[in-house]
């Protein structure tokens, strides 16, 4: 198995630097006006952390880059939880305003190389439209988009370079118990229920339905956040891509 690991605090890691180089090489070969990187993975897998590190490294190299998160495009509570769909499919189909995310952010930049998005979106903490999302990026820049279920078949072709992060279900739950208690005020019982009944089975459904590994350029094991490991295709198929 091919492994590359390094600490991710402080100076850019070897892995982040390699990813940035691969992204720039791909961008040069594509010759597009707008270049979109997708960072996909389970909840608590480190998507935001990696996306920020990539933006920082690309910016250091003189490339205008911004991060956009699908978490800023949550649907209202009654949409996420009030559907007639089973809970597994509620997360998959109803968690995010994918129409606005794709048609307002991803597609405009991918096709035109210009992004001017300024809209008040839902703040899921209060279930109110008070979260102003402003995203601006011009021609020649790189948009690093991150979020859950990012590489769905319906719009995966809009991503020019795709990264899939992997963590085990046990690691995901352990991180969620800490994060959701500290940041979202959830009890241990609530967190365990959400992940066992909604998020874990939903991601398994996503792996079966959309096979994100098929379109990911790289798969990274983030079980140890300070030592991420780049997996080769065989190892990725064995540990990260099976539902």
Give the residues covered by each predicted segment.
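P-loop (Walker A) phosphate-binding loop of NTP-binding proteins
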Residues: 42
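Conserved lysine of the Walker
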Residues: 47
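Hydrophobic positions on the alpha1 helix immediately C-terminal to the Walker A/P-loop
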Residues: 50
